[in-house]
Each structure stands twice: as structure tokens, then as C-alpha cells.
Amino acid sequence: AKEQGLGQLDRESVGRFEDAHIHLCGNGVQFRSGRQVSAQAGDGADAEAGGAAGGGGGATAAGSEPQARDDVPALSPREHDVPRALETEELAQVRDEYVASARLAIESGLDGVELHAANGYLLHQFLAPNANVREDGYGGSAQARTRFVVEVAQAVADAIGADRVGIRISPAHPFNGVEETDAEETRATYEALVDQLAPIGLAYLSVLAFDEERMSLAQDLAARFGGPILLNGGFSSVTTFADVEALLAEGVADAVVVGRAFLANPDLVERWQAAGDDAGLNEPDQETFYGGGAEGYTDYPTRVA
């Protein structure tokens, strides 16, 4: 769920920032077959703009400018305007747009919202030292760089209930121009973040952890968070059933997040339950990810019993 027209990944990605958008996920909610369904709330165009633009990217609203934590040019191969840094007094408006989008998601019939503070999106930019060079109270120290993320999480939790809100983070994962290369600084940042998130009582913390160093940090964050932990193995390969079992065996995660395999296999759980990695899976078509029409969205076949 994109919180404003400025924050869409591109012109085809789903946005939900006005009452008229409540119907957007209605059909998907109707066909969820008893499962819980959540929307991911994040300023997506910032990631498309290479970790720079906080709300502009490929689709800017008429009369508005792309926004970011700082005025760094976009690295995306697509053509983008150079974003401008958000003024301190504008941050409350951006926070409130996350809240509005979350409310609309719940009114649409969804069960929850995941705040996207990973992969170079706007909230991740505030956390990363190379992206956040602000000189106000939202930049500088590790504690200050977590401030906006915590404010957004608290506001969304207050609006729709903390038990309906999760948050996704990707510590030390260089992506879309955001880098966290200093291990000590990264640990300090995410420990400060999770220490402030824990009292809010969020539904879960989702952490990208795909090697020994990141798993060690995930273990530390899990202990600090004190609630359900989701793990994800990253982008290097499509997650297999064996990968899921290995992540669970680490004893950190309550569940494992699966992306591409699930996109291509709407009945992935049933396939894995029946045959594990011996189950034949549809191959995901990356060209149809993140938007567009029915192709790659509703046309993957399910397993014939």
C-alpha cells in the first residue's frame, strides 16, 4: 500500500492513499480462503530511485516534487527528477500519510499492515548513515536516525492497533543505493530501533538474514524484540523448502517469509506439505512482478490433486 501518489514504485504499482482506493484489494480479500492477508506500506519510489528519492521516482503527482531524506540524485536507469530533502516540518505529514494508508488497508478488509523499513525504501534511508546525512533531530547518531521510523510505527499502531502492524528491516543489506557497511554502527542502529519498537507491541519483526553475521544480529534483535520473529533469506536465490527448514532450525524465527516461490505458486503451502522440494513448482516470471494486469498475478496454475 503506497501512502501517497508520490511514493509509488512506478505507474502500475498499487497505491492506496484516498478513500476511492478502498476497492483496490477487495477481490483479493474475498478470495483469501480463510488466510490472513496484510498490505505492505512503504514509500516505494525511493527504492526505484536507487535509495535516493523518498516519494517521487517515476510517478510524481501534478504540482508536487519527489521527496527524500536528502537531495541525492536517483541511481535508477529510469528517468527521475532529482529529489529534494524533506523539511523537518514535513515529516509529520509523511507520518500521517502512512497512517492514512494503513487505515484504508484495514477498511478494505485486510488483516494487517507491514511497514517497509528495508531494501532502500524511505524508512530504511532514515536508518542508513550513507543515506541519512540530515542535521536536524532525525539524523546524526544511531538513536536519531531511528526516530522517524519509530514515530511512524507508533502512529500506525495507535491508529489500527499494534497487533495489526508488523515491520520489515534488512540490516547491512546493500540495496538500492543504501549501504550499512560499519558492523558496529549497524548493530547500534538496529538495537536502538528494536529497543524502541518492543514496547509498542507490534505483531512481528521481519528480518532479512542470509549469512552468519546477519543471523547473529537477528538473534540479538529477536531477544530485544520479545515478540514473533520472521526471517527471510534474501534475493540471491528463490527460497526452497529446505531453506525454510534450515532457517527454522536456527531457532530464531517463528516463521519464514517466502516471496518469489509464493508469487508463482498460490498453493505453495499445499505443495510443500504434500512433497516438500520434490513438489513441482511454477517458475516465477520476474518481468511480471510488482504491478500490471492479470499476467503473473492471477494466471499461475495451482497443483492438480
Q: Each predicted region: which residue ranges?
A:
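Flavin-dependent oxidoreductase catalytic cores
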Residues: A1, R11, R16, H23-A305
